[in-house]
Structures are given as C-alpha cells and as structure tokens.
A protein has these predicted regions:
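Predominantly soluble domains enriched in secretory-pathway, periplasmic, or organellar proteins
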Residues: 16, 24-371
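Bacterial N-terminal signal peptides
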Residues: 9-17
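Bacterial N-terminal signal peptides that target proteins for export
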Residues: 1-9
Length: 371
C-alpha cells in the first residue's frame, strides 16, 4: 500500500468523521433548538402532551412529546437545568392528583406518580432535588407536599393554610405560596424558607389572592386579587401594599382576573382581564409602588385569558386562553406589544435553552422578574 494511498484513506476517514459529527449536531439542533419553548398542551385532543417550538424560527413546531394518558386538567410545569428533568402536575380523569417527570434529553417519562391528596402549580428547588407541590385549590388540606424530584416520594409536609394553589420560586427565593382559603388566610401571600421551612406572610390583601409574580430581587410582588379590577403590589421589604385600579373596565364584578407577570427587564407588568374579556393591561412599573396603566392589548380570539408569561430575554409575551380551551396561546412582541403569532392552547409553558447539546438555562411558567 503506497504512502499516497494511505494519505488518501486518512483524508477520506477524516471527512467522514467531520460529516458525521456535523450531521449529529444538526440533528440535535433540529430536535433541541437553542431556544426552545416547551408547552404542555391543553386542547382535548392532545391534553398532557408537550409541544416543542423553535423560538428563533417563528415558533416553528419541532416535535410533540407523547407523555401520559388520561390527563383531565394540567395544573403546572417546572424544569431543572441542573438535572435535565421536567415535571408536569395534572389531575387525571378520575380526579387523582398526579405528577410526571420527563427526561428532557431523551424525551422519555421517568416516573408518573399520584401525590396525595392532590396537586396544583408546582415549583422546583434550583438544585433540582426537591419539588414543592400544592395540594389543590379545590381541596381542604392545610399543607403543601415536599417531593423528592428523583423518585416522586413525598418527604415532608409544610402546614400553614388550606386550599393551596400557586407555588413560585423566584430568582432570589424563597418559596412563595398563595391559597384559596375562605377562612381569611387566603388573603395573605406566604413565604416559606427552603432550608428551615419557617413561614412568614404578607397581607392582608383586599381579598383572596390569585396569580402573582415576584421581581428578581424579591423586593416586590404583583398580585391578582378577587373582586378587583386591577392589581395590588406589595413591598416585600416593608410590607406596604398599594392598589392600582383599571379606570375603564367592563361592567360588573371582576371576579378574579387570572394572569399577571413582569417583563424580564421589570419595566412593565402585564395583567389579563377577565375570562370573558379579550383585554390585557400593560402597566408601567418604573416606580413599582405607583404603577401607571400605559396600554391595553386586545387578543385575536375576542375572548378572555387565564395565564401569561414571558421568555427569558424579554422578546416574547405569551397569553393563554381560558383553561382547556381550543383557542390558541397568543404570542406578542414584548417590546412593541404587537401580536406576532399563535401556538396551540397551553398555559403551562417555559423556555429551555441548549448549547452543545446541554441545557444552558431555563425559563419559568411565571412571568418573574429577571433584571
């Protein structure tokens, strides 16, 4: 075998290896785009599955992950960048509260467990080891469950108020929790220390709380409040609570406006109107304790909404329709406030970013502050 022949073989082998690596990298990018939106589907035909969208390609659908059967009501989603595991809380067709764990790297369901006595909008510790799972707004239990994220086993109960609903773990912590308790304790927002499990609270507010969002330094929290056309803002440092009302709103009782969040730069708070009104209110938050209503957006559907959140960079705002609706989730340019598209119905969604085949950062189901 001549030297020239050997050299040619080595060159061809090198080209083959490079081509194979490029093809593998291209396939990984197609499967996991650098900025991916993972959205748990709510429509009746696909409820509980997860659609993945390429955010940098006009939210092009990339894949749909078939997960578990018999999902009746999706209650929340959380993900750990540290472990690559994603968690979905849901109620099945029998009314049992469940959580399933998905491995983001291979799209497989790792476990699917019933959590007694129920589940609601869960969150995960930044280290990926523990889930904090409310016991359902329609229940009567006076605690939330702390769950081993690796196995689904409940390892602790934290008692404080009944009908626990939305848990949140903002960038600066601690664990936040609201409840739908009718005994007066639902008029407070609870803070739970993730190390000692000591509990403190902010309030009372004007009524029972709904969705809320905390800024990046855990200095301010914005809240939906039952019966209020507007929002309340609390200083977590002083305990002061102010009320910002919508001057021109539909007639009648507000009920509970459902959906609120900071833009990542914290310059604005977006707030959904009622479940039948297609408006989204945009508040100027340059002075968090003196919000100014600056704009009102109108949804394409002409109907109401139930949730909203943002991507990590602040490019997009996502406004979800009422629960289990066939209406799509509308995408807005978060800077210009223009509508730029619609994806399938989902209010349980978050961003996952990839670099070199690994998760580089993760977003949140809430519109938390990121400044």
């Amino acid at each position: 075998m001549t030297t020239k022949y050997v050299a040619t073989l080595l060159i061809l082998l090198g080209l083959f290896v490079i081509t194979a690596k490029f093809a593998r990298a291209t396939e990984e990018m197609r499967s996991n785009p650098p900025r991916s939106l993972y959205a748990v589907n709510e429509s009746s035909d696909h409820r509980g599955s997860i659609s993945v969208y390429d955010m940098d390609a006009g939210h092009r659908p990339v894949k749909t992950l078939q997960t578990v059967r018999d999902v009746s009501d999706v209650r929340g989603v959380a993900v750990s960048g540290a472990t690559g595991k994603l968690y979905v809380a849901y109620r099945n067709v029998s009314g049992t509260g469940m959580v399933y764990c998905l491995d983001v790297y291979n799209d497989s369901v790792v476990w699917n467990r019933a959590i007694d006595p129920g589940v609601d909008r869960l969150v995960i510790n930044p280290d990926g080891k523990l889930l904090y799972v409310p016991t359902w707004e329609g229940g009567s239990a006076d605690f939330i469950n702390v769950v081993d994220a690796n196995t689904g086993d409940t390892v602790r109960k934290v008692h404080f108020s009944n009908r626990s609903h939305d848990a949140q773990y903002p960038l600066s912590g601690p664990i936040f929790q609201e409840t739908k308790a009718e005994d007066g304790s639902g008029n407070y927002l609870y803070l739970i220390d993730p190390t000692s499990y000591a509990i403190s609270r902010i309030g009372p507010y004007l009524g029972i709380l709904g969705p809320y969002a905390v800024d990046s330094t855990s200095s301010y929290v914005v809240n939906n409040v039952r019966g209020l056309w507007g929002m309340q803002v609390a200083s977590l440092k002083t305990g002061e609570i102010i009320t910002a009302t919508v001057p021109d709103h539909p007639p009648g009782d507000a009920g509970l406006l459902h959906g609120i969040g900071w833009t990542p730069d914290q310059s604005e708070v977006w707030q959904n109107s009622s479940g039948t009104d297609p408006r989204v209110y945009v508040w100027d938050m340059r002075n968090p304790m003196a919000p100014v209503l600056k704009e009102t957006l109108i949804l394409r559907s002409g109907r109401g909404s139930h949730w909203l959140t943002f991507d990590i960079k602040g490019d997009y705002g996502y406004v979800a329709p009422v629960k289990n609706s066939a209406d799509g989730t509308e995408i807005f340019n978060a800077r210009t406030h223009t509508s730029v598209g619609v994806i399938g119905s989902s209010e349980d969604m978050l961003e996952i970013d990839f670099a070199d085949g690994k998760i580089s950062q993760v977003g949140d189901q809430y519109g938390i502050g990121r400044r």
